């Protein structure tokens, strides 16, 4: 969440930076200021009354020693006590309302973030490789069906639409990709692998910013206190909630494989056909916790770690920077990496790399002790390193052969155990 002091001291600047975002969150700034002022006024009056009560109580003791009547003064003490209790209620109510408002205000976009209303204003900043020349490319649905690799029908029968069953070489390829992703990010790029639960508490979802805004998109228990994770970002970052780290502990770099669960699955049609948008998918997530002065520089490094996966697999991709209107709720700056899928004839997002500044850390109370011994909020980064099954889709469609087989990229062969998937092998 945003620092209340920043809002208090620079309300018009905060509004100006929030206005280019989608939605009307900037309108909440005045409500925040009103709640903050009411809470602070209640606390100020309470402190004054407590001082008066202390002084009056001493006066009562002195008067009683002299045998003088103290009934009127004692009445005032009772009156003060009643007022203090009322002020406690007012302060508590306004503090709760203030927290609720702050939880619904997104992060401030980085000052150099491109300004735009939606994804059509996202600039392309990098292009790697070339689109493969494939005559009449088949899409992954047809390719995988012919090879018996995946079944949407089985997924629908077991669970419902938007779920996939992998079989034979299809399941083997998914496992190979996961191991390839993890090994690349841990062995080569220096992340510590962590294994985390796939179910988290509500407070963890609030900590990384998925709640309260995106609650309808999440799978939760009936009382909405426990949730299936939409991304490993949630449990991994929350490993350090309510923690004060030492400066020497930073940076912390973690990578985790998890399945991810999301209710939203998009509309029907070719753009969402097959595995493009599903309710459950696998992903390797990268998370960094670091000092504020390092965060935007390291975002570029993290992005290169995600890009390295596509380069090793020889997949054509582009990088776009999200404009203010397309920026994620908790993010100050985001790059999307989109891989080319020949059978779809479009780019598919496989990684989103973001810097959250101290936004998540404030929600999680994640701090570190600096060289002067003062507690400072950490900055957090995360990015997909990368997501499946869109990577799976691009791989099938890019390496399809005229005979219907799928060539396995050289970097993946040691993990898959073969250099090709043929109908008789699937």
UniProtKB/Swiss-Prot annotation:
Purpose: Catalyzes the attachment of serine to tRNA(Ser). Is also able to aminoacylate tRNA(Sec) with serine, to form the misacylated tRNA L-seryl-tRNA(Sec), which will be further converted into selenocysteinyl-tRNA(Sec).
Record carries keyword Nucleus: no
Binding site for L-serine: 231-233, 285, 384
EC number: 6.1.1.11
Domain notes: Consists of two distinct domains, a catalytic core and a N-terminal extension that is involved in tRNA binding.
Coiled-coil stretches noted in the UniProt entry, renumbered to this chain: none
Subunit note: Homodimer. The tRNA molecule binds across the dimer.
CDD domains: SerRS_core
Family classification: Belongs to the class-II aminoacyl-tRNA synthetase family. Type-1 seryl-tRNA synthetase subfamily.
Compartmental location: Cytoplasm
Region spans: Disordered: 44-67
Protein name: Serine--tRNA ligase
One GO MF term: ATP binding
Polar residues: compositionally biased ranges: 47-59
């Amino acid at each position: 969440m945003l620092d209340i002091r920043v809002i208090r001291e620079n309300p018009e600047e905060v509004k100006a930076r929030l206005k280019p975002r989608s939605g009307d969150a900037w309108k909440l700034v005045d409500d925040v200021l009103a709640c903050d002022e009411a809470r602070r006024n209640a606390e100020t009056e309470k402190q004054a009354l407590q001082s008066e009560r202390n002084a009056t109580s001493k006066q009562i003791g002195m008067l009683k020693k002299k045998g003088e009547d103290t009934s009127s003064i004692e009445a005032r003490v009772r009156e003060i006590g009643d007022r203090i209790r009322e002020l406690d209620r007012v302060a508590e109510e306004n503090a709760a309302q203030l927290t609720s408002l702050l939880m619904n205000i997104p992060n401030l976009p980085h000052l150099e973030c491109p300004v735009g209303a939606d994804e059509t204003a996202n600039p392309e900043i990098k292009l790697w490789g070339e689109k493969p020349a494939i005559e009449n490319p088949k899409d992954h649905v047809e390719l995988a069906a012919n090879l018996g690799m995946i079944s949407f029908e089985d997924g629908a029968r077991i669970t419902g639409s938007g779920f996939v069953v992998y079989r034979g070489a299809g399941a083997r390829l998914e496992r190979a990709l996961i191991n390839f992703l993890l090994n690349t990010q841990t062995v080569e790029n220096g992340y510590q692998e962590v294994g985390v639960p796939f179910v988290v508490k509500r407070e963890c979802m609030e900590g990384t910013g998925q709640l309260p805004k995106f609650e309808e998109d999440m799978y939760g228990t009936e009382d909405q206190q426990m949730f299936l994770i939409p991304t490993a970002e949630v449990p991994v970052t929350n490993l350090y909630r309510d923690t004060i780290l030492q400066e020497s502990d930073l940076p912390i770099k973690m990578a985790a494989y998890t399945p991810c669960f999301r209710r939203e699955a998009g509309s029907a049609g070719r753009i969402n056909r097959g595995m493009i948008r599903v309710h459950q998918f696998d992903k390797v997530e990268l998370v960094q916790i670091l000092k504020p002065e390092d965060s935007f520089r390291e975002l570029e490094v993290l992005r290169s770690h995600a890009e390295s996966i596509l380069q090793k697999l020889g997949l054509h991709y582009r990088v776009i920077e999200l404009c203010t209107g397309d920026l994620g709720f908790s993010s100050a700056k985001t790059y999307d990496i989109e891989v080319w899928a020949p059978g779809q004839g479009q780019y598919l997002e496989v990684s989103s790399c973001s810097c959250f500044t101290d936004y998540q850390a404030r929600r999680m109370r994640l701090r570190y002790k600096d060289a002067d011994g003062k507690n400072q909020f950490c900055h957090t980064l995360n990015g997909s390193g990368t997501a499946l099954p869109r990577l799976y889709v691009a791989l099938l469609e890019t390496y399809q052969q005229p005979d219907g087989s799928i060539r396995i990229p050289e970097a993946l062969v040691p993990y898959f155990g073969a250099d090709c998937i043929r109908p008789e092998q699937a």
